[in-house]
Regions:
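Extended helical coiled-coil dimerization/tether regions that scaffold
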Residues: 162-280
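Short glycine-/polar-rich loops that comprise or flank the Walker A/P-loop
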Residues: 67-71, 148-153, 327-330
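Conserved helicase/translocase motor-coupling segment
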Residues: 372-391
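Conserved P-loop NTP-binding catalytic core
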Residues: 40-104
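Electropositive, glycine-dotted interaction segments
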Residues: 85-185
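Switch/communication elements of ASCE P-loop NTPase nucleotide-binding domains
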Residues: 1-47, 51-53, 236-367, 374, ...
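Conserved nucleotide-binding/hydrolysis micro-motifs of P-loop NTPases
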Residues: 77-81, 160-163, 317-320, 381-382
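Short alpha-helical segments and helix-capping/turn motifs at coil-helix boundaries
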Residues: 51-58, 131-146, 245, 319
Length: 391
């Protein structure tokens, strides 16, 4: 699994939050309790992991004298260490070119070195930020770069989703279809050869180059992911996505939303299955605008993801939780406010009568997960009394 533990300290409404991520994790609770703050803290961690995207709006919202934010993620590299050791032993037979062999071998050695002193093959990275200062990291930039490559990050924020423009899909597909530097150079040479062998096309490209040169401007080369994304668009001869031969504007928000999320999840799943990566996935309120049947469809799409994927989901949907709880690999955390601070509590699942019998969980049972408390009563009189909305 990618991330095994998260600790957040003094981030907005969060004084201290510890979450273990052994399964698919669902955060449930009332509006305004801080579920999104938990996801945003992880997003903030990743957005600054190898870049500078510093904000002064991340500090304790309840205590102006609290001037330090800490976010710590623990990564499990056990699978990568096994793969790296195997690959190092096999490289002598795979590559005749010493440069290529050395480059790959050094990369795998650097992965092993990350956790060489750790028996459990995990590494904890802490981000610390003090008001008015920059961010300090517990590990150097090179190590963080490797971790970001091994554990790519995807944040599906459904509330701010543009369901008619699916630009983020191409970013994910770019990660899936990313090519090596040597493959990129080969493809670029093939394109140049095609252009140069056609006089008309070559003249057009020459004219474009002269336009940039005369303006004293240049084009910044794309990153590996951006290059792969552009390559995918060329292969499909476009980037606008349609459904059943119609543009996305034709369909309802709910229809587009569920298709968008499912497409992203399938692409991320292929990354986990086919590449040496274990993606970190956050999904914020995926049930927005969805018909109940679409919620069931979405829950099923989440639960069939590769076992290496352990998404963190924030939701208000009792139906989504009910559907997901039909599987064993789900952990629930209740999120609530106490003295204006976000508090998380691990919740227990409803027990089965026996290993051979399936307990029928009703909507009332699931709804109790979203309640502040549960009152057990005996008899119709007590039930009628405590069901009175005026009490």
């Amino acid at each position: 699994m990618p991330v095994t533990h998260i600790r957040i300290e003094n981030y907005k409404s969060i004084k201290r939050c510890d979450i273990d991520l052994n399964n698919i994790t669902a955060l449930i609770g009332a509006n305004g309790t801080g579920k999104t703050n938990i996801l945003e803290a992880i997003n903030y961690f990743y957005s600054n992991l190898t870049e500078n995207n510093i904000s002064e709006m991340v500090f304790d919202a309840n205590n102006k004298f609290s001037n330090q934010v800490k976010i710590t993620l623990t990564f499990d590299l056990s699978n990568f260490v096994i793969i790296s050791k195997t690959q190092i032993n096999d490289f002598a037979d795979l590559f005749d070119d010493n440069t290529e062999k050395s480059r790959h071998s050094e990369y795998f050695k650097s992965i092993i070195a990350l956790v060489s002193s750790q028996k459990e093959k995990t590494i904890s990275i802490q981000m610390s930020q003090i008001k008015g200062r920059g961010i300090q990291w517990s590990e150097p930039f090179q190590k963080r770069t490797i971790l970001k490559s091994l554990f790519p990050f995807f944040y599906i924020d459904v509330r701010n989703l543009d369901i008619n423009e699916w630009a983020e899909v191409w970013n994910v597909l770019g990660e899936l279809s990313k090519v090596s530097n040597s493959e990129r150079k080969t493809l670029e040479k093939q394109v140049r050869d095609i252009v140069e062998n056609d006089i008309e096309t070559a003249n057009k490209v020459k004219a474009i180059r002269e336009v940039f040169d005369s303006s004293k401007l240049s084009v910044v080369p794309e990153t590996s992911k951006e290059f792969a994304s552009s390559l995918s668009k060329i292969y499909f001869s476009g980037e606008k996505i349609q459904q059943k031969g119609r543009g996305l504007q034709y369909f309802s928000t709910g229809t587009n939303s569920v298709k968008y999320i499912e497409l992203l999840l399938r692409a991320i799943n292929e990354i986990a299955r086919n590449k040496m990566k274990e993606p970190v996935v956050l999904i914020d309120e995926p049930e927005i605008s969805l018909h109940p049947n679409f919620i069931d469809e979405l829950a099923d799409a989440i639960m069939v993801l590769d076992s290496k994927l352990k998404p963190i989901i924030s939701t208000h949907s009792s139906r989504l939780i009910k559907r997901m709880l039909s599987f064993e690999s789900v952990t629930l955390y209740n999120v609530k406010l106490e003295n204006n601070y976000t508090v998380t509590n691990l919740m227990k699942r409803f027990q089965q009568y026996s290993p051979s019998s399936k307990y029928r969980v009703l909507d009332d049972h699931i709804n109790s997960y979203f309640s502040k408390g549960i009152l057990f009563v005996e008899g119709e009189t007590e039930l009628e009394l405590f069901s009175n909305p005026y009490l």
